[in-house]
Amino acid sequence: MYYSFMTMKQSDDQIRAQIFKALSDESRLAIIRTLYVSGKELSCGEVGEKCNIVKTTASYHFKTLREAGLTATRKDSRTKYVSLREDTFQTYLPGFLETL
């Protein structure tokens, strides 16, 4: 039982480390802030424009945030939309979004 507790704890720590790594960049924080303030999903292009991030750089940041579980992406025809995964923030960083 102790072993399974430690394994589960380690997994949570790995998730937290990935989240903190994703949030350690000012551009990614700007993306999170933009999505939070908008209160809705936005196209990747809209987020890039609002944050003044070029498309290729924005794509890298969106991938990093998605892999950390902080955002979700959906594709509609040729447009990709990104939204916050507020459940992840509530689980691992309660109150964080309100500080933006």
UniProtKB/Swiss-Prot annotation:
InterPro entries in alphabetical order: ArsR-like_HTH, HTH_ArsR_DNA-bd_dom, HTH_MetalResp_TranReg, WH-like_DNA-bd_sf, WH_DNA-bd_sf
- Organism domain of life: Bacteria
The HTH arsR-type domain covers which part of the protein? Answer: 8-100
GO MF annotation list: DNA binding; DNA-binding transcription factor activity
Q: Which SMART domains match?
A: HTH_ARSR
DNA-binding region in chain numbering = 44-67
What keywords does the record list, in alphabetical order? Answer: DNA-binding, Repressor, Transcription, Transcription regulation
**What Pfam families does the record point to?**
HTH_20 (PF12840)
**Could you provide one GO biological process annotation from this protein's UniProt record?**
regulation of DNA-templated transcription
- Tell me where the signal peptide lies: none
Q: Identify this protein by name.
A: Uncharacterized HTH-type transcriptional regulator YceK
**UniProt key word Magnesium:** no
Segments forming a coiled coil: none
